[in-house]
Amino acid sequence: MAEVKESGILIQDVETKNIMTKSTLPVGGYSVNPYVGCTHGCKYCYASFMKRFTGHTEPWGTFLDVKHWPAIKNPQKYKGQRVVIGSVTDGYLPQEAQFQNTRKLLEQLRGSEAEILICTKSDLVIRDIDLLKELGKVTVSWSINTLDEGFKNDMDNAVSIKRRLDAMKQIYDAGIRTVCFIAPVFPGITDFEAIFHQVRNQCDLVWLENLNLRGGFKKDILDYIRKKHPDLVPLYDAIYNKRDRSYFRGLEDQAERLAKENSCPFVDNELPYGRAEPGHPVIVDYFYHEEVRGSENTGRRNPKK
């Protein structure tokens, strides 16, 4: 496919020698990204740093490279390994309906016995329920950091929160492990307790991560806060300019209380496998995960003040 522009998105084909990349994430294993770029265009996206390595000069969210790779010849190589699909893209972008890269990847991982973790903001994943059930050890995680569709629309071009919640329920009801990834938690805006009560009966884990501001989007987010939430400016200044971690330390305590009050396990930086007792998902503290050294869930938190 030659370079084309569809609905304002620049799309082109790229060749890659190996679709599987050893992960440096605390959750360990391998990272797999069937696309370069992400058309959700989230204003807080840490993955925008990828532009440095791809040669793209277009704004993040306005380009998409469709990867082509040699077929995975020996899927058993990944037996027992965690394979994260969508660490710096979303495997279920709207364009996946046309290109089907993620479905092709899942088909190639048949028989691998890998632990597959899919990270998405889409409901297109329900298309692949048949494959997900066949693969066995699969987890599907949706990023949901608000129940306010207006705030969501300010931040990203992905499908509505309602559509994400509906997809989560369908996947959960199909017997597939699900995660509500409450991330990034925006100080003073994200109500993670309200989200917890919305999803507790349709997910196995609730995973919490703080908003990180770095690079070019730090100014954009702080400008947004000044414009839309001026009352929160002192809080954001304390956290993101003065590096005060007390706000999120308080949220950690709040999350632990929430877990105790609702008879939910509470863990630090782990991603335990298995299904939770219905209505009692595991709450995972992933705040300031850079404090955790090591990977493959063997790291230990080294708190900073």
What are these regions (language model features)?
Residues N157, K169-T190, N241-R245:
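Conserved strand-turn element in the central/C-terminal portion of the radical SAM core barrel
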Residues E134-V140, R200-L205:
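Glycine-enriched alpha-helix->loop->beta-strand junction motifs that scaffold or abut catalytic
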Residues V88-D90, K121-D123, S143-L147, A183-V185, ...:
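Active-site beta-loop-alpha junctions enriched in small/polar residues
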Residues W69, R103-L106, I129, R164-M168, ...:
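Generic structural signal for well-ordered alpha-helices
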Residues R110, K133, L165-G175, E256-N262:
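Surface-exposed amphipathic alpha-helices with a cationic face
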Residues Y30, V83, I116, V140-W142, ...:
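Hydrophobic faces of well-ordered beta-strands that scaffold small-molecule active sites
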Residues M1-T139, L147-F151, I161-K162, D173:
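Conserved Radical SAM active-site core
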Residues A2-E15, A194-K305:
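Auxiliary Fe-S-binding modules of radical SAM enzymes
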